[in-house]
Amino acid sequence: MRMRFIINAALIGAVSAVVLTGCNAAANKNYKNGMECFNEADYDKAAGYFKQAVEADSNNTAYLVSLGMTQLELLKYDEAQASFDSAIELDQDCADAYRGKGVVYYRNGEYTDAMEAFDKAVSLSDKSGQVRTDSLKYYASCQYIQGDYQGAVDTYDKIIESASKSDKAELYFLRGCAYIKLQDENDAVLDYEKSLDYESDNYETYCNMYTNLKDGGYTERAESYLRRLLDKDKKDNLLFGKTYYNLGDYDKAVEYLESEYKDGNNEAAYYLAMTYEAMENYADADKLYQEYLGKHPNDAFIYNQYGAYLINRGKYANALVYIETGIELGDSDAMQGLMYNQAVCYEYKHDYDKARDAFEEYLKSYPNDRAARKEYD
């Protein structure tokens, strides 16, 4: 699993921290309304309010940065870039705007440009501020994606000491991921344990630790993190079902997941579908994937998962439809898997020109994927 990077909380904090200057009453009211909508994740309404604020006072960087961040959440990257550029034209020292530009580049897979923007944001930000922390996390993520794992470790070193407690769980986890890539199991596990000191009840954290350790070749250590979940006092059918699925004990996974699914848990439907797929119960797997897709049409990961399922079933044309729908959603966290599977689909369909073009585009964004490089060459 590729390292996932959460930005919403940091964006909200950055928007809240921008100082208003020279604004009229109407613009200020629209800005406040926009912030309320943004904090409630109603980005369409937030964008409308921020646009009205900008129209009323086009010389206010806070309004432009807030609009750009909202456009980011709406995946309108060209519009977001324009908003951040306008803010920078007004204030060459606007760290928030440079950070926003970096996020646009990051989501578009333009990592060199992203690093330049984040570096600029860091140089303009307070040494203990959230903009600096957020920008350095992105900078390290760019290094990680491009295969500069030692560089990522060095960048995390700069952040961790001065980071807030709320950030440290994620930062230790991310540095641990980089250590795994450097084949440094000991330091990776030390960082994972430090991460758990700050956040010990997050199931996804254990699963991500399991996945990264397993992918790094440390299978026994990886499974120990999942088994710790089963030792918890709290009995959680969904948690147990997901854990048994990851451990490959599919009969027990079904036992727990079916119970949750019958109680209406949508996440249980997703994991139950994957469990049925692993058990070669394709009829039930297909039914549940379709059900989950119907309820989560904007989840790029499910399009990739279902696309991979269809590839394994030899239904390449159908798989391509779902994979390309997922790509259109523009989710950078899911994009690597989607782009890779798109290229694989073309190859299996014997459309070798399109397969080569797709692998070429993939390798521009993920140049260190040796398996993809081998396919391309």
List each language-model region with its residue ranges.
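TPR alpha-solenoid repeat register
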Residues: Y63, A97, V131, S135, ...
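Structural marker of alpha-solenoid helical repeat scaffolds
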Residues: A56, L90, L124-S128, S162-S164, ...
